[in-house]
Amino acid sequence: MNYGEIKTCDIANGEGVRVSLFVSGCTHHCKNCFNDVAWDFGYGKPFTEETEEMLLKALEPDYVDGLSLLGGEPFEPENQRALLPFLKKVRERFPKKNIWCYTGYLFDKELRGESRARCECTDEMLSLIDVLVDGEFVQELYSVALAFRGSENQRIIDVKKSLETGEIVWHDLVSRGISMKFN
């Protein structure tokens, strides 16, 4: 797997201060994607053990709330295979930090159902993620007023609660004063 960018102090892609990893490779090709350069699986630099260690070091400070995975597409099967061992390390070393993941795949229909995104790593990778922002970016549904989403069709899902209940459970941002607009 390659990655296009790492941000060690990101406040735009999840709650609080985050370390964000932008992986390379995406087959969605959303119209007006903010990161279309990362569609190419060969874009950027190789994701190595040194990269993992640098990210783990960046997660150490107490002010860092967690890790965000973006792309490209973290749930392309080849990316899942590279990310799963890393996410296990993050969970082991930082059990109190949260993991957010942005994906164009739908949680209930494609990641939990049958689709090209499913592979031997999918269920375990989902079990390590706290919050999933799912759904392709749709330019016609774009709004700058959305918290942590680009378009109104995207959902912010509490993965742990959704897996426990078998139903989609929205992540609770409203109770913490973050306005969310839903149609």
Question: Where would I find each of the regions flagged by the language model?
Answer:
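Hydrophobic adenine-recognition pocket in adenosine-nucleotide-binding enzymes
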Residues: 26
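Receiver (REC) domain switch/active-site residues of two-component response regulators
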Residues: 130
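Conserved Radical SAM active-site core
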Residues: 1-4, 17, 35-101, 105-115, ...
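Short, conserved loop/helix-junction motifs that constitute active-site signature segments
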Residues: 124-127, 150
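P-loop/Walker A phosphate-binding loop and immediately adjacent motor/lid segment at beta-alpha junctions
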Residues: 86-91, 142-183
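N-terminal [4Fe-4S]-dependent radical SAM core
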Residues: 1-22, 31, 35-42, 168-169, ...
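Glycine-rich nucleotide phosphate-binding loop and flanking beta-alpha elements
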Residues: 75, 139-140
